[in-house]
Curated annotation (Swiss-Prot):
A Pfam cross-reference name: Ribosomal_S19
Protein name as catalogued: Small ribosomal subunit protein uS19
Membership in a protein family: Belongs to the universal ribosomal protein uS19 family.
Purpose: Protein S19 forms a complex with S13 that binds strongly to the 16S ribosomal RNA.
A GO cellular component annotation in the UniProt record: small ribosomal subunit
Entry GO MF terms: rRNA binding; structural constituent of ribosome
Keyword field contains Glycosyltransferase: no
Length: 91
């Protein structure tokens, strides 16, 4: 279930300030953030945001198709190494 329309999308204040500052300065450097729950807004298009996955910051380049999604959706937290084989092998 999504967030109520009267409340509007959630975005961390510090992240929004950094994005707006880069827009006014015409700067496109990487922005580090731990806010995985922030919603991607149209002002973020063209920026690269490094989203923390619990271990490292994963750079995410924001495109138009990402608007409305959360930043955490693009930085996976778990690594899938495949199913383990039997130790005994085939008999």
């Amino acid at each position: 279930m999504g967030r109520s329309l009267k409340k509007g999308p959630f975005i961390a204040d510090s992240l929004l300030k950094k994005v707006e500052k880069q827009n006014t300065d015409n700067d496109k450097s990487v922005i580090k953030t731990w806010s995985r729950s922030s919603t991607i807004l149209p002002v973020m298009i063209g920026h690269t945001i490094a989203v923390h996955n619990g271990k490292a910051h994963i750079p995410v380049f924001i495109t138009e198709q990402m608007i409305g999604h959360k930043l955490g959706e693009f930085a996976p937290t778990r690594t899938y190494r495949g199913h383990l084989r039997d130790k005994k092998g085939a008999r």
